[in-house]
C-alpha cells in the first residue's frame, strides 16, 4: 500500500475519506476535530455522537458534511474528551480506521497524527506506531494512505520512520 506524507490541512488533501482521531463519545471539541467540524458542519459531530459510544479500537463512518470527502472516519484514541492517549490506543485507532476505510472500499484515506494533540502521545512514538500498523495492514480495496498534519514535527516524525529523512 502506498504511503504519502503531506504537510498541510487534512481538509485539503485529495482523499476519499478522512480520519478524525476521536473520543469515544463522538464529541468534536479539540484538535483536528474542531477544524473538521468548523469546515464540514455540525452534522458531522451530531452523527458521531448518535453512533457513540465508540470504543477505542473501533471506528464509525459519518457524513463529511460540506467537505468534499465521501465521509469522516471517527477512530477514538481516548475514551473521554481531552483524556491522555497512549501508543497502544494510537495503534488500535489507526488499525480501526484502516479496517473501516477498507471495508467501505475507499481507495485513499487521509490520517492525521493520532493521539498527539490533546492525547499527549509523543510524535515520534505515534509516527512509529501508525506506520507499523499501516505496513502490517493487508487491504482489499484501500490503495493509499496519506499521512497529513499541519505540525512540522509530526510530518518530520513520519518521514523519519519511513526513511524519507
Curated annotation (Swiss-Prot):
Signal peptide extent: none
InterPro entries with a match to the protein in the record: Macro_dom, Macro_dom-like
Pfam family for this entry, one: Macro
SMART domains per record: A1pp
Domain of life according to the entry: Bacteria
Gene3D superfamilies in UniProt: Leucine Aminopeptidase, subunit E, domain 1
Limits of the Macro domain: 1-165
PANTHER family linked to this entry: GANGLIOSIDE INDUCED DIFFERENTIATION ASSOCIATED PROTEIN 2-RELATED, MACRO DOMAIN-CONTAINING PROTEIN
NCBIfam families, per database record: PRK00431.2-2 (NF001666)
Name this protein carries in UniProt: Uncharacterized protein aq_987
Natural source organism: Aquifex aeolicus (strain VF5)
Amino acid at each position: 500500500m502506498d504511503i504519502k506524507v503531506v504537510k498541510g490541512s487534512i481538509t485539503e488533501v485529495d482523499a476519499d475519506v478522512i480520519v478524525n482521531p476521536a473520543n469515544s463519545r463522538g464529541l468534536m471539541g479539540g484538535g483536528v476535530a474542531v477544524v473538521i467540524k468548523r469546515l464540514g458542519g455540525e452534522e458531522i459531530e451530531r452523527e458521531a455522537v448518535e453512533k457513540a459510544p465508540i470504543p477505542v479500537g473501533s471506528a464509525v463512518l459519518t457524513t463529511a458534511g460540506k467537505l468534499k470527502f465521501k465521509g469522516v472516519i471517527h477512530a477514538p484514541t481516548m475514551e473521554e474528551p481531552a483524556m491522555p492517549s497512549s501508543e497502544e490506543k494510537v495503534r488500535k485507532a489507526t488499525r480501526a480506521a484502516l479496517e473501516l476505510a477498507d471495508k467501505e472500499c475507499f481507495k485513499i484515506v487521509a490520517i492525521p497524527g493520532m493521539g498527539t494533540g490533546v492525547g499527549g502521545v509523543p510524535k515520534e512514538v505515534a509516527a512509529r506506531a501508525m506506520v507499523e500498523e499501516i505496513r502490517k495492514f493487508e487491504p482489499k480495496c484501500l490503495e493509499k494512505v496519506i499521512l497529513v498534519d499541519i505540525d512540522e514535527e509530526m510530518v518530520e516524525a513520519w518521514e523519519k520512520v519511513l526513511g524519507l529523512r
